[in-house]
From Swiss-Prot:
GO MF term set: 4 iron, 4 sulfur cluster binding; cyclic pyranopterin monophosphate synthase activity; GTP 3',8'-cyclase activity; GTP binding; metal ion binding; S-adenosyl-L-methionine binding
Transmembrane in keyword set: no
Positions bound to [4Fe-4S] cluster 2: 257, 260, 274
Top EC class, one word: lyase
Pathway this chain belongs to: Cofactor biosynthesis; molybdopterin biosynthesis
A biological process from GO: Mo-molybdopterin cofactor biosynthetic process
E.C. no: 4.1.99.22
Organism: Ectopseudomonas mendocina (strain ymp)
Designated name of the protein: GTP 3',8-cyclase
Length: 331
């Protein structure tokens, strides 16, 4: 018999899975991957059936929230078939997707119909040239059209994600908040994760803390702490007089590890117990050596959780903490 929940050595119960369905993306965001990124051969990527087997095992062990990530998850062929199966799982309290928004104009309504409840959409700039510099793609209008389509599709909540960098887009914080407020969206501001080596900028020089961002917002808006809990690392503040909540993801300035309730599985089937550590369990090898053996998979997950570290040790200097890019991990 297997236990019906996953608990790490520090007593934290794991209820949230971030499941990457592809390492591929139609953008090349400077903080996420290199321009000449080499993607994994397709045979190394988990099949949709294998992805469902992983999700099913986690659900059987008490996971109640699943977020589908990438790369860009919406470029994965036949993704809707996986989402429909997950959307039918009554045990799940939440099925969400993180996307760059490029495919949402066509995909928003089918995603909602498949059972996706919440969307996170990356948006680092409202200025066309700056957006193109961040993403290395001139597709801001396409993303904005996708946001409009998502609003029309009737998701429970839509949240924007903005990575803030000093001297690159920190002057747009208020504009991004206004954009969210006008559309009834939430927004999270993110301190850049030190994953992979970047050449486009110096992370030390572009670091912008969540406290700095919040102070800028409070120059125009009153913020009050929110009790909102989504299962992720954001800490939320309500913009007084609006529907908008502002979140802050602060891996550097406000370590969020103490109540970590999540793990990641990469598109290649690696179980990542912590963003800040390279240790990973190869689930793909197990899945392909013992197809259909759900009990063996659950046992492997339970044993792996004994190795989950207490916290990461991210730094803001140029030392690369983890060698994999965010796109390889699952955003």
């Amino acid at each position: 018999m297997h236990t019906n929940q996953l608990v790490d050595p520090f007593g934290r119960r794991i209820t949230y899975l971030r499941l990457s369905v592809t390492d591929r993306c139609d953008f090349r965001c400077t903080y996420c991957m290199s321009e000449d990124m080499q993607f994994a051969p397709r045979q190394q990527i988990l099949s949709l059936e294998e992805l469902y087997a992983v999700a099913d095992a986690f659900i059987g062990l008490g996971v109640r929230r699943i977020r589908i990530t990438g790369g860009e998850p919406l470029v994965r062929k036949n993704l809707l078939s996986l989402l429909q199966r997950l959307g039918e799982r009554d045990e799940l309290d939440d099925l969400a997707i993180t996307t760059n928004g490029s495919q949402l104009a066509e995909m928003a309504a089918p995603l909602r119909a498949a059972g996706v409840r919440r969307l996170n959409i990356s948006l680092d700039s409202l200025q066309r040239e700056r957006f193109a510099a961040f993403t290395r793609r001139d597709k801001l209008d396409q993303v904005l059209a996708g946001i409009d389509a998502a609003r029309a599709a009737g998701f429970d909540r839509i949240k924007l994600n903005s990575v803030v960098q000093s001297g690159r887009n920190d002057d747009e914080v208020l504009d991004l908040v206004e954009f969210a407020v006008e559309r009834g969206l939430d927004i999270s501001f993110i301190e850049e994760m030190p994953l992979g080596s970047v050449v486009s900028h110096s992370r030390e020089q572009t670091f912008c803390s969540s406290d700095e961002v919040r102070q800028r917002i409070e120059q125009r808006h009153a913020l009050v702490r929110s009790s909102k809990v989504t299962g992720g690392p954001s800490r939320y503040w309500q913009v007084v007089g609006t529907q908008t909540q502002v979140g802050f993801i602060s891996p550097h300035s406000h370590n969020f590890c103490g109540d970590c309730n999540r793990v990641r599985v990469t598109a290649e089937g690696k179980l990542v117990l912590c963003l800040g550590h390279d240790n990973a369990l190869d689930l793909k090898r197990l899945l392909r050596a013992h197809p259909g053996d759900s009990e063996r998979l659950r046992q492997a997950l339970t044993e792996a959780l004994r190795l989950k570290p207490e916290r990461h040790h991210f730094a803001t200097d140029e030392q690369v903490q983890v060698v994999r890019f965010m796109s390889m991990t699952g955003g």
